[in-house]
Amino acid sequence: MTYLSSNQLKQYEDKGFVSPINIFSKDKAKQIRDEIEMIEKEMPGELEKSGRYNAHLISPLLDEVTHNPKILDAVQSLIGENILVCGTTLFIKNPNEKGFVSYHQDAKYIGLDPLNWVTAWVAITDSNEHNGCMRMWTGSHKENLKQHDQNFNEGNLLTRGQTVKDVPREETTPLILTAGQMSLHHPTVVHGSDLN
């Protein structure tokens, strides 16, 4: 079982996220990427816009990822054993294409209450500062929900372009992950990612 260590639990409590957590081998991560690329090739447009939500419903392999015991055990460490997967989203950021995620809080637009849930993000390719990895505003989960503007900027992968303004980049932490690793974050931590 991949229950989180006491240090990881403290990181989540203090910072609003925990990362990295080893889930898959690089070979398994490549198999998942190959599956996504096969869907893109054989069903053009299927994973674009609203099609990128709940892709686990069209792919047995992606469904297997969604119900992976290592992921569920880590989530259970934070929220307990009554786990409901309420959705999956693919954020596909191809090199040299416009694609970023504006700084936002998941709780602002997902609408689940109480805020005793967690977002799991699994990297299927290496994610680092050179290719626009996710950044967390460390400790921002301890504050109230922030005002979000809707900025429909070209390339923003969020449906409404929901954006928290004036995020101090020097207070953000890049989540450096290798393919097959995961991060977990609190629903009110402010996070986003740059262009690939």
How would you describe each model-predicted region?
Residues 1-112, 149:
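Non-heme Fe(II)-dependent double-stranded beta-helix
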Residues 25-26, 91-93, 108, 127-129, ...:
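Short, solvent-exposed loop/turn segments at secondary-structure junctions
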Residues 61, 74, 106, 120-123, ...:
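Short, hydrophobic/aromatic alpha-helical segments in well-folded domains
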Residues 79-80, 125, 188:
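Hydrophobic/aromatic-lined pockets within catalytic cores
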Residues 92, 122-123, 136:
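Hydrophobic side chains in beta-strands
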Residues 104, 111-129, 176-179, 184:
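Short, conserved beta-strand element in jelly-roll/cupin
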Residues 129-194:
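Double-stranded beta-helix
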